[in-house]
Amino acid sequence: MGKISKAVRGVADIYNGASLIVRIIVGLIIGTVLALTMPHVTWIGEFGTLFVAALKAAAPILVFVLVASALAQGTSKLDRRFGTVLFLYLFTTFLAAVVAVLTSRLFPQTLSLGKAAKADVVPQGLSEVIQTLLTNIVANPIQAIIDGNYICILMWACLFGLAMKSIANESSKAFMANVADAVSQVIRWVINLAPFGIMGLVFTNVADNGLSAFTKYGSLLLLLVGTMLLMVLVFGPLVIFIFLRRNPYPLVYRCFKESGLTAFFTRSSAANIPVNMQLCEKLGLDKDMYSVSIPLGATINMNGAAITITIMAMAAANTLGIQISLPAAILLSVVSALGACGASGVAGGSLLLIPMACSLFGISNDIAMQVVGVGFIIGVIQDSVETCLNSASDVEFAATAEYHAWLKQGRQLPAFMYSKKERAKLGIEA
């Protein structure tokens, strides 16, 4: 028995000693191989289901206790940096919609429309999306934690934290801080099991879908993914460069390696909140800031969603022979950006906001829902890339706002933001 326990400890030490990224890549490879060789062994996919469920269950509690604890301690500093984060989230979402309009004009797409998709809730206009957001803000806080309604969670956490700050004694505040630390530790344990979760998620996707999504709608999918990559590799980094005046790609690479990879397979910005918070800690960001900005980003920083809504609406217009003027294209960018900010509050996310954008061009709801149906077909890949972009950029822009403030204060940035030559000159170790 002693030999068995010793062997188990040895395996655990090897597992924990390896980099999380390396373990995730190994899980990805194993999941793909198993899906191609043993697609009938469906229980392997349960690892992915359990992993995503655990993250989704823990994330709302984590957000509530971190924000409430920070405010109760009196350490929350929602200063000018928060305004910068908010601006970056909203501006880049609009920029993503503009980029999508440009790529759609350069590479116009048409659709082969078939049976209309069915949906329980479809927003009919921008006013309905805004109304949904406002309603979500004042929802029941317990129900908000159950549903993962982060706008509501943030509001109640702020109110609860401010109330605790004014009436609670030091021992109560210390207890809240301990609860926040305990929840954070639980999240670390869950994230440590990410390789098994990724293995299950990859297994399910490959076994169920294979490469079928590429065959019928390959050009549309290529435009969607290409536009998102353009935002990731060109326009997003350009915004970061304007604020930091230095090479943005070390930060971009770090965020996509540690946040985007996980988000690609979980396909949920909410489930990736704990991963993003852990990454923010590694990047040296202020906990009082990122505990608010990251869950807010998961709600309103929707670059990928804005791209999806815009391109699908433009494709629908092209299919029906509708000529889109420049003013109409600009209006579409605004509507797509605002609508994308409400994607987290709508069942089905960005795809079910397509009819709202289509309504700008007088496209009937029946036809718009057929476009949604096409979206569901390519959704396995489109949604993965979209979530990857959305989630990784949450950290990118939170870090950009923080580092921008550091530079104004004369502080040095983390070592990875400097070149080898600069590190040697400044005496910084990598």
Swiss-Prot record:
GO terms for biological process: serine transport; threonine transport. Involved in the import of serine and threonine into the cell, with the concomitant import of sodium (symport system). It is a multi-pass membrane protein. Its main location: membrane. GO terms for cellular component: plasma membrane. This is Serine/threonine transporter SstT. Keywords: Amino-acid transport, Cell membrane, Membrane, Symport, Transmembrane, Transmembrane helix, Transport. Belongs to the dicarboxylate/amino acid:cation symporter (DAACS) (TC 2.A.23) family. Gene3D superfamilies: Sodium:dicarboxylate symporter. InterPro entries: Na-dicarboxylate_symporter, Na:dicarbo_symporter_sf, Ser_Thr_transp_SstT. The gene is sstT. It comes from Bifidobacterium adolescentis (strain ATCC 15703 / DSM 20083 / NCTC 11814 / E194a). The chain crosses the membrane at residues 24-44, 47-67, 82-102, 144-164, 186-206, 223-243, 294-314, 320-340, 361-381. It comes from the Bacteria. GO terms for molecular function: amino acid transmembrane transporter activity; symporter activity. It catalyses: L-serine(in) + Na(+)(in) = L-serine(out) + Na(+)(out); L-threonine(in) + Na(+)(in) = L-threonine(out) + Na(+)(out).
